[in-house]
Structures are given as C-alpha cells and as structure tokens.
C-alpha cells in the first residue's frame, strides 16, 4: 500500500467513525455518560479482533483494550490511548462530513442555511491551500477530536500488521468521557495496560506534540437569594442573578481564555444558569504552575466569601473539584 492509498484508507476509516454519534453527556454521572459510546466501543472491539490483536476486551465502562505482541525482542513496550467521545456543544449529534479541496478564501459549508467558515475567524485555513479538508455541513461538530486520533491508532495498527513492520509490544486503549473531565482515563485498569511509556493521541495540529498539561479544577457556586414581589422588594429582595454577576466581576478579564496564551493560567466561566430564586456559576480553573494553581483556587474561595459578606441574607455554597493535574 503506497502513501496515497494509506491516506485514502485513513480518510475512509475516519468518515466511518464520525458517522457513529458518540457525544458524551456532561449532565450524566454514568460512565460512559451516553449509550452511543457503547456503539463506538463495539466497532473498535471488532476492528481490533479483526486485526488479530490479543487480549481484546471491553470493560463495564466501555473502555476498549488490546495487545499486539512485538516481533522484535529487547525493545521498550509502548501504549497508545485515544478517547472515543466527542464534545456536546448543543449542535446536532448527527455528522454530515464533506471533503473539500481548499483553494483559499471563505468556505460555504451549507448554502441552504447560509453557514460559512471564514478565514477571518480561522486564519489557520490558509496553511492548507491546495489540500483536502474534511468539514461538516455546519450543523454539528465534526468530531475530529477525537475520531481523528482513534482513526490514526487503528490505521497504524493495520499498517504494522499488513506490512509486517518491526515493533515491540504495543497496547492500545480507547476510553470514554474525556470531554467530561477525563473520566474514562481515570478508571483505566493499568494491569491491562502495562507499558514502558505511552502516548495520548488526540486532536491537534499536524506534527504537534504536547509534553505536559495544566492543572485543572472546576468550581461550582450555588446562590440562593430571597424572593418577593418587586412592589415590596426594598430591603427584602436578594437577587441571585446580580450576586452571580458581582461574583464574576471580581475576576480580571485579562485572565480569561480569550486573553491568555501559552502557559498563562486562566479562569473560564463555562456555565451560568439563574432565575429569581437561585443562580449557579461554573468556573473552570487552569494553570500549569502548581503554586499559581493553588493561588487561583484560593482566589475563587475568597471571591465567594467576599460576595457572601456583601449579601449576608443570601445562601452561597461552593466547592472545587480537581479534574486532573500537570504531570510534566
């Protein structure tokens, strides 16, 4: 199989995977958080068995593992991990991909709905002039994060086997619910994944290698106000919506994702829901440096205490969950 044939096979594999809706559900506490991830797991299980891998299993959390014995002695064993869920951003779970040879400029993804991807918003497009790019029709995410990673792992296994390439022991793991806080990876049974070192294969730029991650925390703040009719509200009404906005106002706009880069830490106000009685704010905390990360968590706690002092009649509860840590 030459390079062009390999690339075509990879594209076809990717298109077959994105046709399987496997969005994770951030509202669910189950693991996997969506039934659709089971469908993806079964497809990968069948593929690994077809390749002839050993010890192919799907556990109770839809984690798929397999083992390819080495054909070379005395070399390190390596693992490859890829998450099989895609993110739910409120768009359609059904993906309608299209392959477009990009010739520059803005691209119309959906003429009927007047959906465009514009160079002004995505200047990285211009790096791929003259190349085929896989887009959606604009009604969904594509799911390249991480169906592209899954496709590459499966394609690499097929090439190793069909071309009898030399390799050491290889183990693979496909995990659910990365998008909801690395929940699948956290319960991966390492007794089924004994390797000297491993790589996570995930969505990113061509040739990109990430050697560390940030510390990640998730703060949830629940605010209960005091309701009354606005005609008799003076001195009585405590509006949780305004308390939530006051809380957010304690944070610098310069320390948000849209104003930071590289190893800058930040606060991401990811979700807010409110009504006249209650409000909820979710703040994602990110920082590479351990001391700065701890300081950011303290800042959130102190900001909550400050608004509680400002509004003593309100009931404010908060907590910070550790999502993952920087293991550089």
Give residue spans per PLM region.
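Predominant activation on well-ordered alpha-helical scaffold segments within soluble catalytic domains
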Residues: 11, 15, 42-45, 150-158, ...
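N-terminal capping segment at the start of a domain
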Residues: 7-35, 135
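Phosphate/diphosphate-binding glycine-rich loops and adjacent basic-rich segments that engage nucleotide
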Residues: 199-233, 237-243
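Metal-dependent amide/peptide-bond hydrolase catalytic core
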Residues: 240-328
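Active-site metal-coordination/substrate-binding segment of hydrolases
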Residues: 75-166
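Acidic/histidine-rich catalytic neighborhood of metal-dependent amide-processing enzymes
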Residues: 125-214, 254-256, 260-270, 281-284, ...
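A non-catalytic alpha/beta surface segment that caps or lines the substrate-entry region
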Residues: 29-75, 79-81, 85
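A generic structural motif
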Residues: 86, 140, 227-228, 285-293
């Amino acid at each position: 199989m030459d390079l062009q044939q390999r690339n075509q096979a990879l594209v076809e594999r990717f298109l077959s995977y994105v046709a399987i809706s496997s969005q994770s559900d951030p509202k669910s506490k189950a693991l996997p958080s969506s039934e659709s991830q089971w469908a993806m797991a079964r497809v990968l299980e069948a593929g690994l068995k077809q390749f002839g891998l050993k010890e192919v299993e799907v556990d109770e959390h839809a984690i798929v593992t397999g083992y390819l014995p080495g054909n070379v002695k005395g070399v390190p064993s390596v693992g490859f991990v890829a998450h099989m869920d895609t993110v739910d951003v409120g768009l359609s779970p059904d993906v309608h991909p299209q392959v477009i040879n990009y010739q520059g400029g803005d691209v119309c993804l959906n003429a009927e709905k007047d959906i465009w991807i514009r160079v002004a918003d995505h200047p990285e497009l211009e790096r791929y002039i003259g190349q085929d790019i896989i887009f959606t029709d604009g009604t969904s995410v594509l799911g390249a994060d991480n169906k592209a990673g899954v496709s590459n792992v499966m394609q690499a296994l097929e090439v190793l086997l069909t071309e009898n390439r030399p390799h050491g022991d290889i183990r693979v793991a496909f995990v659910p619910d990365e998008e909801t806080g690395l929940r699948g990876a956290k319960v991966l049974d390492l007794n089924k994944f004994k390797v000297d070192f491993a790589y996570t294969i995930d969505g990113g730029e061509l040739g990109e290698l990430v050697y560390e991650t940030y510390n990640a925390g998730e703060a949830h703040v629940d605010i209960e106000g005091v309701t009354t009719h606005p005609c008799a509200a003076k001195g009585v009404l405590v509006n949780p919506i305004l308390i939530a906005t006051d809380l957010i106002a304690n944070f610098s706009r310069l320390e948000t994702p849209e104003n930071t880069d590289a190893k800058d830490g930040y606060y991401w106000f990811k979700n807010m829901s409110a009504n006249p009685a209650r409000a909820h704010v979710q703040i994602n905390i990110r920082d590479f440096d351990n001391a700065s990360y701890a300081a950011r968590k303290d800042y959130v706690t102190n900001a909550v205490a400050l608004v509680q002092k400002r509004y003593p009649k309100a009931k404010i509860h908060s907590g910070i969950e550790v999502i993952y840590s920087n293991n550089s």
